[in-house]
Amino acid sequence: MLLSASIMLYHLDMFDTQLITENFVMGTNNFPLMAIPFFMLTGEIMKHGGISERIINFATSMVGHIKGGLGYVAIISGLIFAGLSGSAVADTAALGAILIPMMISKKYDGARSTGLICAAGIISVVIPPSIPMIIYGITAGASITKLFMGGTVPGLLMVVGLWVTWKILYRNNDTSLERKQTGKERWVAFKKAFWPLLLPIIIIVGLRGGIFTPTEAGVVAAIYAGIVSIAYKGLTFSKLKDVFIGTIKTTSMVMFVAASAMISAFAITVAQIPTELVQTIKGLTDSPTILMFIIMLFLLLVGCVMDLIPAVLIFVPVLLPVLRAYNIDIAYFGIMMVINLSIGLITPPVGTVLYVGSGISKLGIGALSKGIAPFLFVYAIIMMLIVFFPEIVIVPMNWLS
């Protein structure tokens, strides 16, 4: 991204090392970006602090006994994890490390089970707190709180879609069932998972009530997760090194991409690409709905060959003038863009979440592609449903914000 932007500026006779350096620094000199390392830290604490096991045990106590029960455990756990870290890769790794071996040992289809867990993992980029939505909000100048609140209903629709699809796939399957737990056992499992379950509620209520900003929400989440993990005796001093190293690695990658994208956005702007794009698209259609449909199809293709965060940083500056020309709500579009590109995380050949699942299950990408196909289909339907009925997002987003 940095190289291509530099080449473009050179071609435009605007290559200047001081200008490039200034834009690079400006790319990270943004207060809301501080939320990213804290949410990354929350995910690492959850991974190393024993929180994952408590959440999965609670979900198992509730639905593990029904046919295909471990699939429902994965879906419920994915929803809860989504409200904790905001990272699809972290959530998929945490879920998969426990559930994939368990499901395979219970005679569940390996490819389909891994596909479900990967599909559940990407809910974390839609449900608040979402790291890609923070990136989008900063790039587009949209309210991050509004984006967070607007992602709630689509995220729940994705959960319902996975639930119905899994029910159809496993309606006649005789997999090993977990023992139905008693009310007392469920209560014990709930008590053990209570404090982690409280974190998503704290974040949503805090943002909705104006108690803290999205950046402060990241700090609250990290401190809260740390206190809970220490109280559970899951996070020890020996594990802190791994927690901080993991946080530093992922944060530095995201920040470098964000800084490089600022140079790319500058090059795209001075080349007048957005202006040309507006004029071209206006000749195709006058309908905002048809325009959204065309853009969503385009972004689906982009998601197959490019990771989510670079795609957001590259294409938002290009598409923003088009959205304004058609009076499309930029917060609504941001939610749609994140949902769309998140599908690319579980689509070959670049799908990073799919490779996480492959690494855990030891299955090839070809086999996983077949296993995840039904869930991709459902996600595509949900996305198009929101394109043609934007009120599904806009009404609750405005109310919750």
Curated annotation (Swiss-Prot):
GO terms for cellular component: plasma membrane. Keywords: Cell inner membrane, Cell membrane, Membrane, Transmembrane, Transmembrane helix, Transport. It comes from the Bacteria. It holds the Pfam family DctM. The keyword Cell membrane applies. InterPro entries: DctM, TRAP_DctM. The keyword Transmembrane applies. It is found in: Cell inner membrane. GO terms for molecular function: carbohydrate transmembrane transporter activity. It is a multi-pass membrane protein. Its main location: membrane. The chain crosses the membrane at residues 31-51, 70-90, 115-135, 144-164, 193-213, 217-237, 253-273, 290-310, 330-350, 353-373, 375-395. Belongs to the TRAP transporter large permease family. This is Putative TRAP transporter large permease protein HI_0050. It comes from Haemophilus influenzae (strain ATCC 51907 / DSM 11121 / KW20 / Rd). The lineage of its organism: Bacteria, Pseudomonadati, Pseudomonadota, Gammaproteobacteria, Pasteurellales.
